Amino acid sequence: ESHRQFDEITDVQDKAIRLVNSFGNDEIDVVINDYPNFWVILLYSVRVAPVQIYFSFGFVYFEFGGVDYLLLPKEASPNNKIKTDIIDYDSYNWLESRFLEGPNSEDDARSTLEVIFYPRARQLEPQARYVIGCYGRFEKINEEYLSVIKAILQREETSVFFVFGPGDFSLATNYFTTTGLQDRVIISGASDPHVLGWAFDVFCEQWPIWSGQSSLEVMAKGIPVVSYMHEDLSLFIEPYLSLRDPELVATSYQEYIDMVIRLLVDKEHYEIKQNSAREISRKVTDLDKRAKNVGTQILLALERKLAYTGSGMGRTEPLHRDVPQALV
């Protein structure tokens, strides 16, 4: 039965019976859930599969009746009060589960940019040749960052700084008005990063807190990301270094400026860094190997459970499959 059919059932007892029967009819081997609502806790408590797993998804370690295993990233450090067995998996962080490239093709996005962005950039004097900038919450932008952007704009007069995202952008607006560079800046509110994200030639990452998801999104589009390693937060940033091009992580403002300028004027270097950005993005989003490893661990757990019970929830056939019959 479809999820919609279950949603339409209002009687709690009837719904519970039909849900349990559905699992039995489908002979589910493994059930995995990452949201322990009433129905999940109920189904796990009466046991609807030989192996029942709670996927913490990198956030909360939640134990409740009927959970055989917690599925956790290896980087997690569960406290010793947790009694449930753990299946771990390799993970950079929770961002890996996000789809970085978005639903738009590059051609579709650029067609939209021809209407909503490029005409505005072409009106600038001198006409914008390069687009640098960032997107994300405006509270991540500070005056130190803006001063470095100012230096880049002054060095490369055909560049324009483009920034968009949610929050109060008055700091950026006032800063560039005061410095007389308001005509070299395009500032906008929240918008679709999978359209406007294609506008950047170089993504100038904010600091001291790096931008996280937005940097990975533009890297998936082949856009180089320049970052600054703030010495006061180096320990906090260090786990994220594998998600950046090490040759584009600056340790001084001047180095940051030089990195951005070189990307703008050195075509060969830019193309190399485009490929590097895509490769890092693929490393983050290619989950096949890690997923297969998790699948193998789950399959072994299922084999142990079936061998222990001798019946596998009433079924006596041996398990000769490469993957569990169903993962829900």
Which residue ranges define each predicted feature?
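Short acidic-hydrophobic, aromatic-tinged amphipathic segments that line or gate anion-handling sites
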Residues: S2-V12, I187-G189, E247-E255, R262
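Conserved catalytic-core segment of nucleotide-activated headgroup transferases in glycan assembly
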Residues: D88-T179, D183-S191
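Structural motif
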Residues: D29-V30, V131, V202
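Active-site and donor-binding regions of nucleotide-sugar-utilizing enzymes
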Residues: E1-F64
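Active-site-proximal region of nucleotide-activated glycan assembly enzymes
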Residues: R47-T112
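Conserved active-site histidine-acidic residue motif and adjacent donor-binding/catalytic loop
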Residues: T10-A16, G167-F169, Q182-G197, W210-S211
